[in-house]
Swiss-Prot record:
Family that this chain belongs to: Belongs to the universal ribosomal protein uS14 family. Zinc-binding uS14 subfamily.
Binding site for Zn(2+): C24, C27, C40, C43
Record's keyword terms, sorted: Metal-binding, Ribonucleoprotein, Ribosomal protein, RNA-binding, rRNA-binding, Zinc
HAMAP family recorded: Ribosomal_uS14_2_B
Example GO molecular function: rRNA binding
Domain of life of the organism encoding this protein: Bacteria
SUPFAM superfamilies attached to this UniProt entry: Glucocorticoid receptor-like (DNA-binding domain)
One Gene Ontology term, aspect cellular component: cytoplasm
Cofactors that this protein relies on: Zn(2+)
Full protein name: Small ribosomal subunit protein uS14
Subunit structure: Part of the 30S ribosomal subunit. Contacts proteins S3 and S10.
Textual note on the cofactor: Binds 1 zinc ion per subunit.
Length: 61
């Protein structure tokens, strides 16, 4: 889990638009962020394996 202070800092409006960065909407993780889903890879994998994200299935070949 991310620090609460860093999550609050990311939500504030930045002075320069370049400084904004994406965080996971569930856990607040800043790295491995999937823009399409708005969450990190860990939360994406967890929710998709449960079947809570529509249209996402595990691939097998």
């Amino acid at each position: 889990m991310a620090k609460k202070s860093l999550i609050a800092k990311a939500k504030r409006e930045q002075k320069y638009s370049v400084r904004t960065y994406n965080r996971c909407s569930i856990c607040g993780r800043p790295r491995a962020y999937y823009r399409k889903f708005g969450m990190c890879r860990i939360c994406l994998r967890k929710l998709s394996s449960k079947g809570e994200i529509p249209g996402v299935i595990k691939s097998s070949w």
